[in-house]
Regions:
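Conserved, mostly hydrophobic/aromatic
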Residues: 16, 38, 132, 200
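Acidic, low-complexity intrinsically disordered segments
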Residues: 1-37
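A short small-residue
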Residues: 23, 177-180
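Auxiliary Fe-S-binding modules of radical SAM enzymes
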Residues: 194-210
Length: 210
């Protein structure tokens, strides 16, 4: 960028690699901007716009620096992510958060979220927001349309993935905002809908502080 971006948003990558059948993003090949380029764009926002925060845009931040053709289980590249966020914070911004990330990606490496939280100074007065695609609580639908959204986990583990990811994120001062898809491909049955409702209800009951 050559002029300040809206809300301090800076793109760090394009594409996803998870292959969900309802998403056009999966048609794009994965491409990444280097930490050096990201840092320079944030500095434009600081110097020309006086923006003291960096809103980091990606389609799934947890695949940054990953090659999905060789990383079949979609494990995050923790080193690349730590390098990226270290570069971001070195600009002097007071706050940063990614736009999007998968729930499975947040827990595939148990050290990832705690380490990133330390780098970004996440805490009670500095919460990190992230948008995550829950999409459906239906095991049938998630397996049919988005099985790699759960990688490295299996479709039958979806409810556990959702609950464990919310727990991990919240414990490290990350606040996920969920998206849901109603009537997925005109294939959603009443039972699929109730399965989603049950998952959300269980999440609320089991993690009331989430």
């Amino acid at each position: 960028i050559v002029e300040p971006s809206m809300h301090g948003m800076v793109e760090v990558m394009r594409g996803c690699g998870r292959g969900c059948k309802f998403c056009d993003v999966t048609l794009r090949s994965l491409r990444y901007y280097s930490p050096e380029k990201v840092k320079k764009e944030i500095e434009v926002n600081i110097k020309k716009g006086g923006i003291d925060r960096a809103w980091i845009h990606s389609d799934d931040i947890f695949v940054y620096g990953m090659d999905p053709t060789t990383t079949k289980n979609m494990e995050p590249n923790r080193d690349a992510l730590e390098e990226l966020f270290t570069a971001i914070m070195s600009t002097g911004v007071k706050h940063t958060n990614p736009t999007h990330g998968t729930l499975a990606g947040a827990i595939a490496d148990e050290k990832l979220i705690p380490n990133l939280s330390k780098i970004t100074n996440a805490g009670p007065s500095n919460l990190t927001g992230i948008q995550c695609g829950l999409e459906t609580g239906s095991i049938r639908l998630i397996e049919k349309y988005a099985d790699r959204k759960l990688a490295p986990y299996k479709p039958e583990e979806w409810h556990w993935v959702v609950k464990e990811a919310v727990k991990t994120l919240n414990e490290n001062y990350w606040i996920p905002a969920f998206t849901l898809i109603m009537g997925l491909d005109n294939d959603e049955t009443p039972e699929d809908g109730w399965e989603t409702i049950r998952l959300i209800s269980e999440l609320e009951q089991e993690q009331p502080d989430s």
